[in-house]
Design a protein with these regions (language model features):
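Intrinsically disordered, low-complexity segments enriched in proline/serine/threonine
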Residues: 22-25, 60-62
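A short, exposed loop/beta-hairpin motif centered on an aromatic-Gly-Thr core
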Residues: 23-33
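Short aromatic-glycine-(Arg/Gly/Cys) micro-motifs in beta-strand/loop hairpins
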Residues: 8-22
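Short, charged, surface-exposed hinge/linker loops at domain edges
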Residues: 1-4, 33, 37-67
Length: 67
């Protein structure tokens, strides 16, 4: 499974990061790195919950960060 994290800076200075392949994985951070870290953690949590609920089968995961 190939996932990507996209980020952008909001007008108020906060950073927004999301994983488009996982609806609902959208987080804010004070810095870009903070937002990216939070998005990665949330994405892994969502995938783990899906596996626990039998909604998928284990497969290698690759997460890339869009520039």
């Amino acid at each position: 499974m190939q996932l990507s994290i996209e980020s952008e800076r909001e007008e108020d200075g906060r950073w927004l990061a999301e994983v488009p392949q996982l609806p609902g994985v959208l987080v804010y951070g004070k810095t870009r790195n903070e937002a990216l870290s939070k998005a990665q953690i949330l994405a892994l949590r969502v995938l783990a919950e899906r596996l626990e609920n039998g909604e998928g089968s284990p497969e290698p995961i690759s997460i890339s960060i869009a520039a």
